[in-house]
């Protein structure tokens, strides 16, 4: 039994807090809004993010960060990627000894092109014992209903990953695998949000399953190209944190990236979409970062480029789809052949 702090009282942080509580751990769920924390402690609910869900008594809400961190050795980092550096700066000021951080946010930082684990390592320095990444096809709305869910964990220190695997594993509904390919696990989890935005746009435009299947398949090729250019194992993209996460995010109404894309496809502007969502849409920032990184590395990512033009250059979504369809002829398996040839 562990005392574990979960930083970020949104849907995913709350869902993981529930898993940990079900596993017998004492969970301190931190959020910066006092009224939300009061609701968690007094009503055992978090209605804005997970309506209708009762939270276990083992979850205690905190709005005081240092109090939430007092004496804990394991911290689950579930804040949006844009808030990671500022939150970790505050975390450092509270610590008396190094901690293990379980990073569960998915994204790549624009400008620096850092993955989440790299951001954590940079910000924490000597205060970091280990960083473990948890990723996979896992909508919070289904986890809190205790529906079967499977994820993977990865770390530069696989002994730490196995310890986190044990802490999160629930034999009734939450299965955890290990995967030593940290780069692949993070890239797959981050870039699937880009393709989910594109899939939502396709659905919003009224295109059917054929178009979405093509976006998912060719999107996976883009993810693998960029991931392997960064040093990932191509087989990771055939697993939970690759095609698994891609499928669930591109096909479910629970996906905020898909929902945002759907509204864009129906003609709404990006600012209007983000305001109406009321929650972070990680794929927007990740599209910018992946676009920049692909240019830097010379990796072809036509879907990402088309989405970038829609999000940041005002291109009409239908015109973006038309431009993808009008691309020159090519051999479908060139991507895979080149990737595996580079591994030899």
Curated annotation (Swiss-Prot):
Pathway: Membrane lipid metabolism; glycerophospholipid metabolism. It catalyses: sn-glycerol 3-phosphate + NAD(+) = dihydroxyacetone phosphate + NADH + H(+); sn-glycerol 3-phosphate + NADP(+) = dihydroxyacetone phosphate + NADPH + H(+). GO terms for molecular function: glycerol-3-phosphate dehydrogenase [NAD(P)+] activity; NAD binding. Its main location: cytoplasm. It comes from the Bacteria. PROSITE patterns: NAD_G3PDH. The keyword Cytoplasm applies. GO terms for biological process: carbohydrate metabolic process; glycerol-3-phosphate biosynthetic process; glycerol-3-phosphate catabolic process; glycerophospholipid metabolic process; phospholipid biosynthetic process. InterPro entries: 6-PGluconate_DH-like_C_sf, 6PGD_dom2, G3P_DH_NAD-dep, G3P_DH_NAD-dep_C, G3P_DH_NAD-dep_N, NAD(P)-bd_dom_sf. NADPH binds at residues 11-12, 32-33, 106, 140, 256, 280, 282. One of its GO terms (cellular component) is cytosol. The active site is at residue 192. The keyword Cytoplasm applies. Belongs to the NAD-dependent glycerol-3-phosphate dehydrogenase family. NCBIfam families: PRK00094.1-2, PRK00094.1-3, PRK00094.1-4. This is Glycerol-3-phosphate dehydrogenase [NAD(P)+]. The gene is gpsA.
